[in-house]
Structure formats: structure tokens, C-alpha cells
């Protein structure tokens, strides 16, 4: 009961803050959260929670998705305390473990966003002017933050020991650098059961349409949860994205945000590189790409820019 009370208080505080920031009324915000949850979350999974817990988790996931797709990285930090309360709640039930596995892989985003909030000062404004949001860090600043954070984290995810050696040859067979198997650490923490609130699943967090596009079956067994088929599809997708954008940073940004989003930003800002659009990408993607760079450096001593292009 105690964790439920704490969780509801955190959710309420988060909702109030959001309502104040965007001039949205509390009933409207709650209704938006419920509508998003109905459209995206697997209610059969969440039904294992109490009614109070289920509503709180739905609202939290809705808020997190909204901040992930938002403009400012620092805004994600507002949900850090809530996430720390939601995670153990999801871990209490076998049925909600897939969401717990996904959320656990997200916690570093919340920590780094909070560090940005602390270290980057808000933009100064004139007298009697409303405060401006904390600006997004540059792409290089993000890389530096992630390299610093990951330099203190040497232990492999437990499941990585089981999968890395098995899946690297699959990436090589698809003509993709085998080091990119570590995308799974960022996507799912190497937990093949991970399920995101948006519907991405498995080690490599493939959405249903993407999975089918690259040869996976979702019925009668969802192959996204099977390590080898999901690795094949992920490698094929990464190869396709690099063939399109000719750059691993842009390919990874597209893997996370969608190739249409990346293409539109390149055109809008007349850019030809990741750094040229980084500060305009969705907040999650702004952290996703440098996080993968840091993981590759930590696990393989590899530089993303120096990874070879996929072979024909």
C-alpha cells in the first residue's frame, strides 16, 4: 500500500506540473493519459495490478512518452522519481515484467537528463519575463556526458553474456558491423522479454510493422521475442538505414525516431550530418545516439564514426 500512495503522489505532482507548463487542465491531462494508454498499452498485462496501480502506471507511461517525443531533454528529468517508484511496482508481477524490463533500460536516460538539469543553466531572460526552458546540450556535450557516465559502469548486463557471442555472427552475416549487437543493451538491457509502452518488443525493440517489414512473423509466435530472428531483422534494418543515410549516427537516430523524422529534419535545417539536427530531434533520440556511442566505446573500444559501412 505504501508504494501505491507514493506512486500516486508522484504521478499527481507530475500531472500538475505538466498542466501548469502547458495550460492544460487536470481533467484534460488525465483524459489524454487514459486515451493514450487505451491505444498503446497491453491492458491484459496491466490487469494484474490493482485499479489504482494500473491507472498510475498508465498515466506515468503516457507522461514519459510525451516527454520522450518532446523538444527538451531536461524535461525527462521531471519523471525520474516517479520512474524509481513505478519500476519496483512492475517488478512485483510476472505479467508486468516485460514493461519492467523495458523501464529498467530507460533509467539511465532519466539520470542523465537530471544531470543536464543540474549542470546546464537556464537561458537568462529580462525582468518580468517568464523563465526560458533549459536549452538542449550540443551533440558533443551529450557524447561527453554519456562517456563520463558509462566509464563508471563496467559490468555487462547479465543476459549479455548469453547473447553477445551468439548474435555477433548474425550481424556479420547480414554484412553489418558485429559491434552493433550492443544496440540491445540500450534498447532492452539484453532482456528478450522487454516490451515498451509503444509496442516495441524483444532484445532489439522492434515495432510490429518494422518486424514484419524485415521478415519476422508475429503469429502464432511473436518472433521479436526470439533472439536470433530479432537480431536478423535488426541487422537488416540497420543496414537499410545506413544504405539510405550513409552515416551510422543518422542510421541509429532513424532506428529510434523513424526515418521519416530524420529525413524531414535534414531537409528543414539543410543539414547533412547528425550533429546538424541533433538538438531538434525528439528528446529520447537526442540521448539514444550518444548513449549507443558510449556503450560501443565501453564494451568494444569502438568508435561509431569509424565503424565500417555495411558490405554490399
Residue ranges and their predicted role:
Residues 205-210, 256-268, 289-305:
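A structural motif
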Residues 146-158, 166-170, 191-200, 216-227, ...:
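Second-shell loop/turn segments in exported
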Residues 165, 169, 181, 232-239, ...:
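Solvent-exposed, polar/charged alpha-helical surfaces in well-ordered, non-transmembrane soluble domains
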Residues 173, 185-190, 203-216, 257-261:
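Glycine-rich, acidic and aromatic/proline-enriched surface loops and short helix-turn segments
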Residues 238-267:
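Catalytic and binding regions of secreted/periplasmic enzymes and modules that target cell-wall glycans
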Residues 2-184, 272-273, 279-280, 294-295, ...:
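Cell-wall glycan-active module
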Residues 175-193, 234, 251-256:
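Short, functionally critical alpha-helical segments immediately adjacent to catalytic or ligand/cofactor-binding
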Residues 198-220, 231-238, 264, 289:
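Substrate-binding/active-site groove segments that recognize
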Amino acid at each position: 500500500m505504501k508504494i501505491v500512495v507514493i506512486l500516486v503522489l508522484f504521478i499527481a505532482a507530475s500531472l500538475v506540473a505538466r498542466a501548469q507548463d502547458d495550460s492544460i487542465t487536470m481533467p484534460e491531462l488525465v483524459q489524454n493519459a487514459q486515451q493514450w494508454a487505451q491505444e498503446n498499452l497491453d491492458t491484459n498485462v496491466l490487469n494484474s495490478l490493482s485499479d489504482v496501480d494500473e491507472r498510475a502506471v498508465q498515466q506515468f507511461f503516457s507522461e514519459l512518452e510525451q516527454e520522450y517525443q518532446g523538444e527538451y531533454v531536461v524535461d525527462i528529468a521531471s519523471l525520474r522519481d516517479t520512474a524509481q517508484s513505478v519500476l519496483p511496482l512492475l517488478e512485483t508481477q510476472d505479467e508486468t515484467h516485460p514493461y519492467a524490463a523495458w523501464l529498467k533500460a530507460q533509467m539511465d536516460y532519466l539520470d542523465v537528463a537530471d544531470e543536464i538539469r543540474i549542470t546546464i543553466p537556464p537561458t537568462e531572460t529580462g525582468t518580468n519575463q517568464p523563465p526560458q526552458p533549459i536549452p538542449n546540450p550540443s551533440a558533443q556535450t551529450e557524447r561527453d556526458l554519456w562517456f563520463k557516465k558509462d566509464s563508471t559502469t563496467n559490468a555487462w548486463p547479465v543476459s549479455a553474456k548469453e547473447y553477445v557471442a551468439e548474435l555477433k555472427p548474425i550481424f556479420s552475416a547480414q554484412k553489418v558491423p558485429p559491434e552493433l549487437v550492443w544496440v540491445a543493451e540500450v534498447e532492452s538491457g539484453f532482456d528478450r522479454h522487454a516490451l515498451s509502452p509503444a509496442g516495441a518488443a524483444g532484445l532489439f525493440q522492434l515495432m510490429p510493422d518494422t518486424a514484419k517489414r524485415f521478415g519476422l512473423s508475429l503469429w502464432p509466435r511473436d518472433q521479436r521475442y526470439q533472439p536470433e530472428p530479432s537480431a536478423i531483422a535488426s541487422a537488416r534494418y540497420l543496414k537499410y538505414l545506413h544504405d539510405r543515410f550513409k552515416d551510422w549516427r543518422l542510421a541509429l537516430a532513424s532506428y529510434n525516431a523513424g526515418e521519416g523524422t530524420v529525413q524531414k529534419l535534414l531537409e528543414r535545417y539543410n543539414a547533412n550530418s547528425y550533429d546538424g539536427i541533433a538538438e531538434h530531434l525528439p528528446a529520447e533520440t537526442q540521448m539514444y545516439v550518444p548513449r549507443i556511442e558510449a556503450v560501443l566505446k565501453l564494451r568494444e573500444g569502438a568508435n561509431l564514426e569509424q565503424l565500417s559501412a555495411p558490405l554490399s
